[in-house]
Amino acid sequence: MADGKAGDEKPEKSQRAGAAGGPEEEAEKPVKTKTVSSSNGGESSSRSAEKRSAEEEAADLPTKPTKISKFGFAIGSQTTKKASAISIKLGSSKPKETVPTLAPKTLSVAAAFNEDEDSEPEEMPPEAKMRMKNIGRDTPTSAGPNSFNKGKHGFSDNQKLWERNIKSHLGNVHDQDN
């Protein structure tokens, strides 16, 4: 009778392992191996051995349940998880806070710009005053689009200056002769 009980226990274990699909079932199967020897460097025979081992694995695959790994973004599942975290209830009554309205101040334009009537006017540095002052022909800096050929003494025409100098020298020479 002890033999019968032991025989009964083994099928139960195999049934349990088969139902669970655990490692116990895989451990009971014998492992198949093949030795490959080649005389040409192992190129063609190693490839055929790889093909044979791949075919054997393909034959063993239908007996084992295959696990499919999902790769990608599950947008729908993420939105449902976030939706449970944030809930919006429509029709909920909350007391509305009354914002005190400020009376608009009506100021005249002069009052808006002349708020500091008591303060003294801003003091300008002398350099800024000098630049803003219209000196005329003796402008110290020649700047701007219309200041081409302008020197310290105004616009200068070298040809005219040369003619003036010649006339003055001729006049001086003519006066000395008389």
UniProtKB/Swiss-Prot annotation:
Residue list for modification N6-acetyllysine: K64, K150, K152
Any one GO BP annotation for this protein: proteasome-mediated ubiquitin-dependent protein catabolic process
Region: Disordered, residue numbers: 1-82, 134-178
Polar residues bias locations: 139-149
Compartments in which it is found: Nucleus
Bias (Low complexity): 37-47
Protein's recorded name: PEST proteolytic signal-containing nuclear protein
Modification Phosphothreonine occurs at: T139
Top-level taxon of origin: Eukaryota
Compositional bias of kind Basic and acidic residues: 1-15, 160-178
Pfam families referenced in this protein's UniProt entry, alphabetically: PCNP
Organism whose genome encodes this protein: Homo sapiens
Keyword annotations of the record: Acetylation, Cell cycle, Nucleus, Phosphoprotein, Ubl conjugation
Function field: May be involved in cell cycle regulation.
Modified residues (N-acetylalanine): A2
Sites bearing Phosphoserine, chain numbering: S53, S77, S87, S119, S147
Subunit relationships: Interacts with UHRF2/NIRF.
PTM annotation: Ubiquitinated; mediated by UHRF2 and leading to its subsequent proteasomal degradation. N-terminally acetylated in a HYPK-dependent manner by the NatA acetyltransferase complex which is composed of NAA10 and NAA15.
Gene Ontology cellular component annotations, sorted alphabetically: nuclear body; nucleoplasm; nucleus
